[in-house]
C-alpha cells in the first residue's frame, strides 16, 4: 500500500469494507442483556428466552470456523483452549448462600487462581483439585445472584478477569449476565455474556491471522464496528462494545488463600467421576 509492506490486520481501516455476509434468522445462543426485544434480537433455542442480545454472533455466524455445534468447538477457540489450559492460571467461580440446595439469594464471585488447572484421564479439567486465589483485585468480580430450579443467575454488573496467553489477555464485560445450570455432581454449565469491547475480540482473531483463523479479518473489523451496540465513545458517538455470550463449563474445586486456608468448598464428585471424589463437606459455607 503506497509502496509500504504491512499486515492489513494491524491497520484494517486502510482497506475497503468487503461487506461480508452476516448471520440472520430467529435463533441464537445468548442472554437478554437489556431486558428488551427488538428487530436485532434473537430467541434462545434451548431456553425459549426472547430478546437475546448477541451481535457478536451476527458478525461471526456465517464463517465456516464458527458454523459448528457442541461438542465441537470453533477452530479458533479450540486452539486457544488447548494452548491456554496447560499454561494459564484457572478461572474460579464461587457461589455462597444460606442453602444452595434450595431456591434463594446467593453471592457469586469470580477470581483468578495462582495455579493452572489439572487435567483428568479424559483430558478434561479435574474435579476436586485445589486452587489458590490470586489476591490481585483486578480479577475479582462480585455479583448478587439467585438460584431458582437449579438455575443460577446474577444481577447485571461489570466483569473483568485477567488471562495469561497470547490469545486471551483478559475477558471483560459491562452489564454482565449469566445463566448456569447447577448439576447434582457439583458441576455447572451455561453462558456468561455482556457488552464486550469489540476491539478485544478483533485483536484476539488477528493474532491467529486469516490463514489459521479461516476468516476475513477486514470483514470482521468492519462488521464488529457496524454491529457494536453499546458503550458509545463520548467524542465520536460510535459504539465501542458488542453484545456477546460465552459457553462455560465449571467443575467443583477447593479454593484456598495464599496460606492454604479454605475459602470455598468443593461440592460434589464432578462430571465423569473424574478427579478426587468429594464425599465430605468442610465448614466453609459454600
What are these regions (language model features)?
Residues 1-286:
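Extracytosolic secretory-pathway proteins
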Amino acid at each position: 500500500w503506497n509502496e509500504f509492506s504491512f499486515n492489513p490486520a494491524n491497520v484494517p481501516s486502510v482497506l475497503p469494507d468487503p461487506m461480508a455476509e452476516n448471520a440472520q434468522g430467529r435463533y441464537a445462543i445468548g442472554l437478554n442483556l437489556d431486558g428488551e426485544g427488538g428487530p436485532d434480537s434473537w430467541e434462545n433455542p434451548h431456553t425459549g428466552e426472547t430478546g437475546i442480545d448477541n451481535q457478536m454472533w451476527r458478525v461471526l455466524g456465517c464463517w465456516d470456523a464458527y458454523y459448528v455445534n457442541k461438542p465441537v468447538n470453533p477452530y479458533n477457540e479450540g486452539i486457544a483452549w488447548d494452548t491456554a489450559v496447560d499454561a494459564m492460571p484457572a478461572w474460579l467461580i464461587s457461589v455462597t448462600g444460606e442453602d444452595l440446595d434450595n431456591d434463594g439469594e446467593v453471592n457469586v464471585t469470580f477470581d483468578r487462581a495462582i495455579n493452572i488447572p489439572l487435567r483428568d484421564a479424559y483430558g478434561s479439567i479435574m474435579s476436586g483439585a485445589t486452587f489458590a486465589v490470586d489476591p490481585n483485585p483486578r480479577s475479582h468480580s462480585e455479583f448478587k445472584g439467585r438460584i431458582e430450579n437449579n438455575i443460577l443467575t446474577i444481577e447485571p454488573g461489570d466483569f473483568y478477569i485477567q488471562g495469561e496467553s497470547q490469545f486471551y489477555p483478559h475477558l471483560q464485560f459491562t452489564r454482565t449476565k449469566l445463566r448456569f445450570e447447577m448439576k447434582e455432581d457439583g458441576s455447572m454449565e451455561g453462558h456468561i455474556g455482556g457488552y464486550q469491547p469489540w476491539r478485544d475480540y478483533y485483536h484476539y482473531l488477528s493474532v491467529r491471522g486469516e490463514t489459521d483463523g479461516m476468516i476475513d479479518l477486514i470483514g470482521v473489523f468492519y462488521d464488529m464496528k457496524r454491529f457494536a451496540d453499546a458503550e458509545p465513545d463520548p467524542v465520536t458517538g460510535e459504539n465501542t462494545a458488542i453484545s456477546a455470550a460465552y459457553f462455560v463449563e465449571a467443575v467443583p474445586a477447593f479454593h484456598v488463600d495464599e496460606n492454604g486456608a479454605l475459602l470455598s468448598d468443593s461440592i460434589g464428585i464432578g462430571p465423569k467421576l473424574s478427579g478426587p471424589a468429594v464425599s465430605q463437606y468442610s465448614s466453609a459455607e459454600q
